[in-house]
């Protein structure tokens, strides 16, 4: 549980798919927000001193025994509460209203009619499009609550009890399909909770530098530098805080993109004047990964080997004892590794792949930030655009973009095909429009014909998505002529490839990475 000096709106997690988006939208307004378990007690919440509380959506029915509930004492704290979807149903059930199964599930865009201009709907149109996703509905609001909005299939689409600062909506204002959703959240944060908006990257830098100095003291930090956005921002931020007390270790695990190792060393040793130690451990990693096909096992092996290499190599730094290991763990990494009400999507390389007996204390200065906030932080720190906007690259590297067993041949295919993809996307001027793009190698071959000869070679998959924060994403609509150029080049320039496929699934149901 984090306690912050910023005015904070706490989101209680009841297991809904959009919970992280609520947190992100509130931060977009300049108000700090955190996602916490619904099991948080009233005393724990009070200790955090939030200016507002949001109950998230969730897949359960509030009237069913055993469904997630919050500490009832939370309602007595006097802090404004906004219930969203399951959150408003939970509030209704608690205060004696009636929630029942809807005759049909309402999912998608719906027209909302605002009947009462409560503070939540201040300045908003009487008719507006919202995003619904629910199988239950409120049949009767609790005593003391006013119905603020409805539609034909949802008689209580919004309700409020202004005297107790309790508000609820059946729709999802955090989803961009709700056309005035951001305005509604702004009304809650500023007009109802009294926020002033004191969350910014400039403030974050000042506070984080102070925290790093207090945590580290006169000791030393070893930073796992990969050259990706996250580790680069971590390195520059910590270097700004403690200077030469930071040593960056760049481990080439043999799973890097084309030209990555050379680029990293040049950028950070010459551009930022940092102490960077390069370790070539590619043979060691690939030996450990030989014959391994399970993606979770691959992640664990890579995570463990990283720490073991750090342990061994830091011991060789005779003049400095390394006490801390810095990581670029993000808020999304922590969320995706599972909460009380959500299943683990995948063990994250910065969260679930660490051995329990490691010899370092962790320092993770970005673990409260989303990816786009990290980019903004990088810009604020003066990091060049080519690094800030570098394609996101996972800690396990190409190890999770080669599905199945990892071999030198497969790595070469992914490395070369990915370089072509990145080159052509940049040529087409799409590199800032597309959130993330890469190639992956499915564990499959297919029949083809090249030069009048039958081939039986690999298929390369292209993944490209648009997103704002990486919590949800849609597949990118790359122009056909650009895709044609990419496909033609890969098949002609990369050996042992005879087929290209394009991944057109969103997140959810898929994750961005294939493993």
Swiss-Prot record:
ATP binds at residues 226-232. Residues 8-198 form the Glutamine amidotransferase type-1 domain. One of its GO terms (molecular function) is GMP synthase activity. Keywords: ATP-binding, Glutamine amidotransferase, GMP biosynthesis, Ligase, Nucleotide-binding, Purine biosynthesis. It is an enzyme of class 6 (ligase). It catalyses: XMP + L-glutamine + ATP + H2O = GMP + L-glutamate + AMP + diphosphate + 2 H(+). Disulfide bonds: none annotated. The active site is at residues 85, 172, 174. Homodimer. Catalyzes the synthesis of GMP from XMP. This is GMP synthase [glutamine-hydrolyzing].
């Amino acid at each position: 549980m984090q306690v912050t000096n910023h005015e904070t709106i706490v989101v209680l997690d009841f297991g809904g798919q959009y919970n992280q988006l609520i947190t992100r939208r509130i931060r977009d307004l300049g108000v700090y927000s955190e996602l916490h378990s619904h099991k948080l007690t009233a005393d724990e919440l009070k200790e955090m001193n939030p200016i507002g509380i949001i109950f998230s959506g969730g897949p359960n029915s509030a009237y069913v025994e055993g469904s997630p509930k919050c500490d009832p004492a939370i309602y007595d704290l006097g802090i404004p509460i906004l219930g969203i979807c399951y959150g408003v149903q939970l509030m209704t059930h608690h205060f004696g209203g009636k929630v029942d199964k809807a005759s049909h599930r309402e999912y998608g865009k719906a027209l909302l009619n605002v009947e009462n201009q409560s503070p939540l709907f201040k300045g908003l149109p009487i008719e507006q499009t919202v995003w619904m996703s629910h199988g239950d509905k409120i049949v009767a609001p609790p005593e003391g609550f006013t119905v603020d909005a409805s539609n034909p299939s949802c008689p209580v689409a919004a309700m409020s009890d202004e005297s107790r600062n309790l508000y609820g909506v059946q729709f999802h204002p955090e989803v961009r399909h709700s056309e005035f959703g951001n305005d509604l959240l702004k009304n809650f944060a500023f007009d109802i909770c009294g926020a002033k908006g004191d969350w910014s990257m400039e403030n974050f830098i000042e506070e984080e530098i102070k925290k790093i100095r207090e945590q580290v003291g006169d000791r030393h930090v070893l930073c796992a530098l990969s050259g990706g956005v996250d580790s680069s921002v971590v390195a520059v931020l910590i270097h700004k805080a403690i200077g030469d007390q930071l040593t960056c270790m760049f481990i080439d695990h043999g799973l890097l993109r084309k030209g990555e190792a050379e680029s990293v060393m040049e950028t950070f040793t010459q551009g930022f004047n940092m102490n960077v130690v390069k370790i070539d451990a590619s043979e060691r990693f690939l030996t450990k990964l030989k014959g391994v096909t399970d993606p979770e096992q691959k992640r664990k092996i890579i995570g463990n080997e990283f720490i073991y290499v750090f342990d061994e190599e830091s011991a060789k730094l005779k003049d400095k004892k390394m006490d801390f290991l810095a990581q670029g763990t993000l808020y999304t990494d922590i969320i995706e590794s599972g909460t009380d009400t959500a299943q683990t999507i995948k063990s994250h390389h910065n969260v679930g792949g660490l051995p329990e007996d490691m010899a370092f204390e962790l320092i993770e200065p970005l673990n409260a930030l989303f990816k786009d906030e990290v980019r903004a932080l990088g810009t604020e720190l003066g990091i060049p655009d080519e690094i800030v906007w570098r394609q996101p690259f996972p800690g396990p590297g190409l190890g999770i973009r080669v599905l199945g067993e990892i071999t030198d041949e497969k790595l070469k295919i992914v490395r070369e095909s990915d370089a072509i993809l990145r080159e052509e996307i940049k040529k087409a001027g799409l590199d800032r429009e597309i959130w993330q793009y890469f190639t992956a190698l499915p564990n499959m071959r297919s029949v083809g014909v090249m030069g009048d000869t039958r081939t039986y070679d690999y298929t390369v998959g292209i993944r490209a998505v648009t997103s704002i924060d990486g919590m949800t994403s849609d597949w990118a609509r790359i122009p056909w002529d650009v895709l044609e150029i990419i496909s033609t080049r890969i098949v002609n320039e990369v050996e042992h490839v005879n087929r290209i496929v394009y991944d057109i699934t969103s997140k959810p149901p898929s994750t961005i990475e294939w493993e």
